[in-house]
Amino acid sequence: MNNVIPLQNSPERVSLLPIAPGVDFATALSLRRMATSTGATPAYLLAPEVSALLFYMPDQRHHMLFATLWNTGMRIGEARIVTPESFDLDGVRPFVRVLSEKVRARRGRPPKDEVRLVPLTDISYVRQMESWMITTRPRRREPLWAVTDETMRNWLKQAVRRAEADGVHFSISVTPHTFRHSYIMHMLYHRQPRKVIQALAGHRDPRSMEVYTRVFALDMAATLAVPFTGDGRDAAEILRTLPPLK
């Protein structure tokens, strides 16, 4: 496990890690520090951090769970009831059907407006999911990850410990729900419309997106380079030529 770039302790190499077009890792990391310093913005991982964390999940079941959270923005409860039947991987545009736990608990077919379709835009993930299902051959209507929240957290803690033992450290505390926040931020970094992300993430209230977009307000303010410091001597010379106010 010596081929992974340490994410926090190699500043000379972090610019090599891709985030999104026109965005480097060092800048994105700095923005995250600012945005999360008050606690108003949820903690999230950047794409290279997620890639590294998944690298330290050798168990394919663990790996595919967190890869699914990362690729879809699912809530933990939603992922717990996902079945092979939820996925459509063969079409030109693969996707997954996402139901809330409350909807799944009801009998009968759920209303169409309570089924969320999330496109799977990363072909590598789609191929991994196909390969995993072929290998494990799960029943089509059997949940893929019917485990407790505590079990999911333990799987994640094991990966974090493996990473730290290999010299890879994360500057935020990572939980399963962190992957949902990370998905939303990753989509924003790739300039997807807020309303589209809101729909894909299953947020009913548009205001729920504001906690994420404030990161980009910080970025915009930083790039404006608005000067506030002037030459006091020159200013005094100019003001001296003006008539006094009556």
UniProtKB/Swiss-Prot annotation:
CDD domains: DNA_BRE_C
Tyr recombinase domain: residues covered: 40-225
GO biological processes: DNA integration; DNA recombination
The keyword Transmembrane helix is assigned to this record: no
Keywords: DNA integration, DNA recombination, Plasmid, Repressor, Transcription, Transcription regulation
Gene3D superfamilies per UniProt: Intergrase catalytic core
Name under which the protein is recorded: Probable site-specific recombinase in afa region
Active site: 75, 102, 177, 180, 203, 212
Keyword Transcription: yes
Molecular function terms, GO-annotated: DNA binding
Pfam families reported for this sequence: Phage_integrase (PF00589)
Highest rank taxon of the organism: Bacteria
Disulphide bond pairs: none
Homology family: Belongs to the 'phage' integrase family.
